[in-house]
């Protein structure tokens, strides 16, 4: 971006200056609306989420057999919800900032099959595509026991088709493992940030991995191009896919059920704050949409991004969405949080969700490493760096009087609050890699 344009952008949006300086930044969104006002802009409904829920239930018998690690939950891919009181104390001590309410962790980091939040959307979109093909071919009806998809006849049928996706790692893992298991030929286009172990794991499942020297945007673009030349190839588009988004959104109702089981209340007097790491936006966008449908105006969602990749904060704050990238303003998009190393946000998610998100913030790689170490020490839970992005949120909310006033929160409401950090990945990180992460924390 030339200087004159840059100066005018900063004059209009002074916060951009802090982003360019790679400062840890928080922006509380002045444009939030009620769910009723914001919902029409999403372009999806409660019914769409129910359909996704029903589809996952139809596939449960198949998943329980195809992936024995899901048998205990009857083929439902869901993660634990745990309180982390020792971590809450540690954060308060390190940052000299009390956190009112209770701190919880949602362990999508330990979801079965692929060990990340992407096991929600990625697996769902592969299943939805497989179902569509099998129904159209007359090989399946909605009433069937879907475990029949494990038969050689179906393997043979699906092997005529292929799937392609561009990814920094975790989405590729989910889609690659699931597609290969069903019988699709699958190609994952991986950006330069992708970890070597993720590529190796995919190859061990028979997935074709194409590597790029450039970032996520290039990997997605190349994947899209490669798929266009083959009519039997289906491209899963992380930047624009409504199907992926709906796969994530099912988490809302599931979390509501977990809250009920644990006797946790969410209402006007007991607000829920949720902190979601954000890359291109599909995962956190879909989850936030599901949470809003489940808890209405009593849930407040925040997106967390690395200081080197603040694409969603930049896009929503300036209203430019996918028309601007972090590279346009001189930021390098290089971060240890490989899952969040995205320079240009999803325009679909930004425009759909901008009224339903309470805020956005950035944090440095070092902050993620520090918190990664504290969580391992205090709670014995090991995550990858990007999964800690949400952990910086509760302090930011509790420290901001202006945000609390904007939403009219009383001290008592904040004392009764639940702060939920969405841990997005790390359950499958190899031991030696994890030791390197732990060594970087202070």
Curated annotation (Swiss-Prot):
<dbReference type="GO" id="GO:0009097">
    <property type="term" value="P:isoleucine biosynthetic process"/>
</dbReference>
<dbReference type="InterPro" id="IPR050147">
    <property type="entry name" value="Ser/Thr_Dehydratase"/>
</dbReference>
<keyword id="KW-0456">Lyase</keyword>
<protein>
    <recommendedName>
        <fullName>D-serine dehydratase 2</fullName>
        <ecNumber>4.3.1.18</ecNumber>
    </recommendedName>
</protein>
<dbReference type="GO" id="GO:0008721">
    <property type="term" value="F:D-serine ammonia-lyase activity"/>
</dbReference>
<dbReference type="GO" id="GO:0016836">
    <property type="term" value="F:hydro-lyase activity"/>
</dbReference>
<dbReference type="GO" id="GO:0030170">
    <property type="term" value="F:pyridoxal phosphate binding"/>
</dbReference>
<dbReference type="Pfam" id="PF00291">
    <property type="entry name" value="PALP"/>
</dbReference>
<feature type="modified residue" description="N6-(pyridoxal phosphate)lysine">
    <location>
        <position position="118"/>
    </location>
</feature>
<comment type="similarity">
    <text>Belongs to the serine/threonine dehydratase family. DsdA subfamily.</text>
</comment>
<dbReference type="GO" id="GO:0036088">
    <property type="term" value="P:D-serine catabolic process"/>
</dbReference>
<dbReference type="InterPro" id="IPR000634">
    <property type="entry name" value="Ser/Thr_deHydtase_PyrdxlP-BS"/>
</dbReference>
<dbReference type="InterPro" id="IPR011780">
    <property type="entry name" value="D_Ser_am_lyase"/>
</dbReference>
<keyword id="KW-0663">Pyridoxal phosphate</keyword>
<dbReference type="InterPro" id="IPR036052">
    <property type="entry name" value="TrpB-like_PALP_sf"/>
</dbReference>
<dbReference type="InterPro" id="IPR001926">
    <property type="entry name" value="TrpB-like_PALP"/>
</dbReference>
<comment type="subunit">
    <text>Monomer.</text>
</comment>
